[in-house]
Amino acid sequence: AYPLLQITKSKLPFHFFDDLTPAIVFSKSTFVVVVNKDLPVTHLQELIQLAKTQQKNGGKQLNYASVGPGTTSNIAGEMLNQEGQISIVHVPYKSFPAALTDLISGEVQVLIAPLSSLFPMIKDGKIKAIAVSTDRRDPYLPDLPTFAEQGYPNMTFIGWNGFHLNAKTPPEIVRKIYSDTAKVISEPDFISKAQQMGYQLMSLNPEEAKEMQLNDFKKFSVIVKKSNIIVD
């Protein structure tokens, strides 16, 4: 969330890239486009075509839920609008459970969120998944095509978890945290719990983590600027 705040907030008490340094990124989560189970679409192109048809015919526009302005779910929704050249309406919620409840009931039709938060509902058939955000298919949803496979390679991104430290932290301490965390995430119990939650484990070192975060920053900055997303 903090890298996104660096993009969407005009004033912050710190600078994410100048004042913090990554020690490790230890897991990633695929983002998934999910829709209400009764929406007559099964893949991304059908969703985009439905949105265009309703806009053209003056029908009720589709809505997408987010957990608030400037969040990844909001930026991903605007990414979908820009890439698909559509205007699905943003409906911000104060909490993820509230957004998910309204998606299931049909008050909103679309949500883009981490698989780790949606996995049980997808498995139970309460919502319908139509695309994943990673460059390769997710091992937990191997039959679900990626954005790139469906013609939208610019929508490739992931969610991640990691540890950051004060930028003035001595390098040997940063490396120690990296190595200790890498050991913990290789333990069978940790792996099992991560799999149950839909997370994929990884161990990006400080240099790799910063490169990934800078690439995300550049990609999301373009979307935020075009969509005029500001959180103040």
Regions found by a protein language model. Give the residues of each.
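Paired acidic/hydrophobic, glycine-rich loop segments that form the ligand-binding mouth/hinge
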Residues: 109-113, 128-131, 220-222
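Short beta-strand and adjacent tight-turn residues that come in two discontinuous sequence segments
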Residues: 25, 112-114, 132, 157, ...
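An extracytoplasmic/periplasmic, membrane-proximal ligand-sensing/linker region
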Residues: 83-84, 123, 171-232
